[in-house]
Amino acid sequence: MTISVPATSANLGPGFDSLGLAVDLRNVVEFHPSKFFSVSIKGEGENNPKLKGNNLFISIFNEHYNRLTKKKQNFKFNFYNQIPMSRGLGSSSAVIVSAIASAHEAAGIKVSKRRILNHALVYESHPDNITPAVMGGFNAATVEKNKVFSQKKHLPDYIKAVVVIPNKQMSTAKARTLLPKSYSKESAVYNLSHTALSVAAFFNEDWEILKIASQDRFHQKARMKTLPELFNVQKVAYESGALMSTLSGSGSTFFSMVYDEDSEMIASKLALKFPEFAVKILNFDNDGLIIDK
């Protein structure tokens, strides 16, 4: 059995803990019953020996498999990871979602994407990453009574993502400590209005307004100060024609949305200006979680 989950970019602009989208950079896990437990990793994390034992995936998988079957069974897991770890591209959400889906498949129990999403909420209390990881596309999401409520927009082929990935990790927990403890009414209204406009822009495919709509006063500046070069990344992206340019998740990756015809030019300018960072052009992913038996 094979499970794959895409990378995600969340906290989009003013959409703190509420807006996210999926990009075509995937973590894949293949698994089957085995006499002995074993883990192999290729790609991201392959040189980290701690991940080859009782990692987050294995812990969540075992929890759900044992709950569903009431029995013990060893499995061989082969991981093929493309999503950089702790870079603001949803690596943790990919692990959580793939573990839950894998456990249900291993137990022979069909489960809806919505059910998997709500299970994932136990491990990731904010829906902006886990929702696009499961559903794909652009998502506006909220949590009410321990359930995720969301709306998805399919993203067209004529827009692309350009991501700038610094060689610096940023944990979500640490990034949250950088945020203000309170916000003014003015800032709250600013972000509410810009979030509403951002959602409307995505659903109406009115991309040109995103440069205004994606402005934020809640989280980006406080987090970007830990890596000041990101302010210049955003400046160069906008000067080169990006439709929106925003911190991805809690960082350190910076995400820009661009027209397909501009993607090579914008990526080249960013790579030339910031040679110490990785720059990738990515398609958007509209599938989310994929299960192949």
UniProtKB/Swiss-Prot annotation:
Short name of one Pfam family: GHMP_kinases_N
Residue sites binding ATP per the record? P84, M85, S86, R87, G88, L89, G90, S91, S92, S93, A94
Q: What class of enzyme is it?
A: transferase
Q: Where in the cell is it found?
A: Cytoplasm
Q: Which UniProt keywords apply?
A: Amino-acid biosynthesis, ATP-binding, Cytoplasm, Kinase, Nucleotide-binding, Threonine biosynthesis, Transferase
Gene3D superfamilies, sorted:
3.30.230.10, GHMP kinase, C-terminal domain
Spell out the GO cellular component terms annotated for this protein, sorted alphabetically and separated by semicolons. Answer: cytoplasm
InterPro entries xrefs: GHMP_kinase_C_dom, GHMP_kinase_C_sf, GHMP_kinase_N_dom, GHMP_knse_ATP-bd_CS, Homoserine_kinase, Ribosomal_Su5_D2-typ_SF, Ribsml_uS5_D2-typ_fold_subgr
Q: What GO MF annotations does this protein's record show?
A: ATP binding; homoserine kinase activity
| Enzyme nomenclature, EC number | 2.7.1.39
Q: Explain the purpose of this protein.
A: Catalyzes the ATP-dependent phosphorylation of L-homoserine to L-homoserine phosphate.
Family from the record? Belongs to the GHMP kinase family. Homoserine kinase subfamily.
Q: Write down the NCBIfam families for this protein, in alphabetical order.
A: thrB
Identify this protein by name.
Homoserine kinase
The protein's organism comes out as Sulfurimonas denitrificans (strain ATCC 33889 / DSM 1251) (Thiomicrospira denitrificans (strain ATCC 33889 / DSM 1251))
